[in-house]
């Protein structure tokens, strides 16, 4: 019970779809502010996993008494080819305050990204592209950079002396 939201019951429903998939629905009814649904979906494969949280609501925001809002936080991970770890994360919101106000997420910015990483005994590869969404009222053009791509390569090798080791690094960044 809260003076802002009133009485807030939350009812979870859990469904196992099969051996590798499940979903959970959490319904929220805010006595004074509307209703929300949080859906968590998970799925596994041999070398991959997917997990998504989807938020939908018709709640009071600072802009409107009952505004239809939504957000997603999805993550896909996989190990492909010759030991490449792939991660893709999508985090977006249709409105800048409802995630914090209704305690779904406390962040003031959301970062979506795709990365590929490979680690060998003497080499390291990393590639990333990302996009930021600002959840503040400040100038969004400076707080929402898109980085495509960021590439980092590192190689280690023996030096000229017995205990010496050489490391070469190459890094490139595109804003």
Q: Which residue stretches match the model-derived regions?
A:
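Outer-membrane beta-barrel proteins and related beta-barrel translocases across Gram-negative bacteria
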Residues: 1-175
């Amino acid at each position: 019970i809260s003076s802002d939201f009133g009485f807030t019951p939350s009812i979870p429903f859990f469904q196992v779809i099969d051996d590798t998939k499940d979903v959970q629905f959490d319904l929220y009814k805010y006595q004074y502010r509307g209703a929300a649904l949080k859906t968590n979906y998970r799925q596994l494969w041999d070398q991959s996993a997917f997990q998504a949280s989807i938020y939908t609501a018709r709640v009071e925001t600072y802009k409107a008494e009952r505004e239809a809002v939504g957000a997603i936080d999805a993550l896909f991970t996989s190990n492909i080819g010759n030991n490449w770890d792939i991660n893709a994360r999508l985090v977006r919101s249709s409105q800048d305050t409802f995630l914090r106000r209704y305690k779904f997420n406390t962040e003031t910015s959301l970062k979506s990204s795709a990365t590929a990483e490979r680690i060998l005994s003497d080499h390291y590869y990393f590639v990333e592209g990302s996009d930021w969404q600002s959840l503040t009222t400040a100038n969004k053009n400076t707080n929402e950079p898109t980085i495509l791509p960021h590439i980092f390569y590192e190689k280690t090798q023996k030096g000229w002396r017995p205990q010496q080791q050489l490391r070469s690094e190459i890094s490139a960044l595109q804003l």
